[in-house]
Amino acid sequence: SAQPVRAFTPWVELLSLLLSKARTSAFRDFGKDLDIVHLPRFFRDSQILPDEILLALHGFGGKLRYAGSLPIFELARPLRVSLRLRVVASPLDGPTVFTDASSSTGQGAVVLTARTAPAAVLHVRSHSDVPGFFTTGNALADQHAGHKVLTVREADLHSTLHLGARALSRTCSIPMAVAREVVQACPHCNSAPALSAGVNPRGIAPLDVWQTDFTLEPRLAPRSWLAVTVDTASTVIVATQHGRAN
């Protein structure tokens, strides 16, 4: 977030936050760290960089350059700035395009490029019960972006490895319902008979078959792990405390 955490934040701390945000964005969008980082010129005369800057540059393997002004600013000087209004705050007469622009999912159903006419950008609240044109269109955009656009990679992965629904959901970080749809659409997986649900073995007499599992109970710290053992015949339960689960 760009919101300062204090009323008077040192500029060095703000610079470190900017560096951290730039490196995080580079990893997320390009899969690699920054190649070059430009720092203010007076840092070059310092024997050691401030702790905030060093922390933001931890693990950085690129080049550090010191300059009073970035070279890109020299290229921006001859550019002509257009004062023609391109984005307005109210709807316009023309086509209406809905897109999923959620920052949490990173999905996009529609991308607009090379725009020449003015456009109005509106935010439609999700999960709104108010009926209307914008609510209906936004719901359709979310539905298509959440299912049809996402399942291309998952379908390719399943057609190669034939992963099950649970493994496909964990590998691709998709909902279980979407993973089941991908598996059910595979003709090879549906040709074989489905396995029935498993049944835990049960003893026919006490002390015959036991089942043990670990469960975490934070209130019992420092020995917060419980080894719960059940006699499958008599249903007697025995629980013992442990410091670790192994």
From Swiss-Prot:
A GO term for molecular function: zinc ion binding
Integrase catalytic domain span: 202-246
GO BP annotation list: DNA integration
Binding site for Zn(2+): H158, H162, C186, C189
E.C. number(s) listed in UniProt: 2.7.7.49
Integrase-type zinc finger locations on the chain: 149-190
UniProt keyword terms in alphabetical order: Endonuclease, Hydrolase, Metal-binding, Nuclease, Nucleotidyltransferase, RNA-directed DNA polymerase, Transferase, Zinc, Zinc-finger
Catalytic activity: DNA(n) + a 2'-deoxyribonucleoside 5'-triphosphate = DNA(n+1) + diphosphate
Gene3D superfamilies in the cross-refs: 1.10.10.200, Ribonuclease H-like superfamily/Ribonuclease H
Pfam families: Integrase_Zn
InterPro entries according to UniProt: Integrase-like_N, Integrase_cat-core, Integrase_Zn-bd_dom_N, RNaseH_sf
Superkingdom, natural source: Eukaryota
Name of the protein in question: Retrovirus-related Pol polyprotein
